[in-house]
């Protein structure tokens, strides 16, 4: 009975592997294959959070790979293919969105935050230095004499 259960579980486990889809495309040249690979790695899967369509197992990613392959076969340029995908799915489909009025915060926000942080730290350091300088006072003549006396007695 244990042997039967082990065999059944192994069979079920292998069913999932056998069902995994592997896309096979025929290319006329290695350059075309490289273009396909670059395009599928450059474009993000609309369904997946942070995965390109080359690595995604989502059904929409498989459809996008087929569309890219079809457009490559039609002789379209990389720019035309990317423009088609952006027109259909928006700038989200690109890993490197263009700099425009809608994406300026994405491009310049991190640098602005870093600059703001450096300014805040600089202001804090300057204020502490000024406060420390005000706290240091000179010793009166009586205090200096007492200090000198204490130092003499230590020797």
From Swiss-Prot:
Subcellular location: Membrane
Pfam families per record: CcmH
Residues binding heme, per UniProt: 45, 48
Keyword entries, A-Z: Cytochrome c-type biogenesis, Heme, Iron, Membrane, Metal-binding, Signal, Transmembrane, Transmembrane helix
InterPro entries listed in its UniProt record: C-type_cytochrome_biogenesis, CcmH/CycL/Ccl2/NrfF_N, CcmH/CycL/NrfF/Ccl2_sf
Coiled coil: none
Topological type in the membrane: Single-pass membrane protein
Sample GO molecular function, one term: metal ion binding
Transmembrane segments: 105-125
Keyword Membrane set for record: yes
GO CC terms, sorted: plasma membrane
GO biological process, one term: cytochrome complex assembly
Signal peptide: 1-20
Family classification: Belongs to the CcmH/CycL/Ccl2/NrfF family.
Role according to the record: Required for the biogenesis of c-type cytochromes. Possible subunit of a heme lyase.
Protein name as annotated: Cytochrome c-type biogenesis protein CcmH
């Amino acid at each position: 009975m244990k042997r039967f259960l082990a065999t059944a579980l192994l069979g079920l486990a292998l069913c999932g592997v056998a069902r995994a889809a592997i896309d096979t495309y025929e290319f006329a040249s290695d350059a075309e294959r490289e273009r396909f690979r670059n395009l599928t790695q450059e474009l993000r899967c609309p369904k997946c959070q942070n995965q390109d369509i080359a690595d995604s197992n989502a059904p929409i990613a498989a459809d996008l790979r087929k569309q890219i392959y079809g457009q490559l076969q039609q002789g379209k340029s990389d720019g035309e293919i990317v423009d088609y995908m952006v027109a259909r799915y928006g700038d989200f489909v690109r890993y490197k969105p263009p700099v425009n009025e809608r994406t300026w915060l994405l491009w310049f926000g991190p640098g602005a935050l870093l600059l703001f942080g450096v300014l805040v730290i600089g202001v804090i350091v300057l204020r502490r230095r000024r406060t420390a300088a005000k706290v240091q006072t000179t010793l009166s003549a009586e205090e200096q004499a007492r200090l000198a006396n204490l130092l003499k007695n230590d020797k």
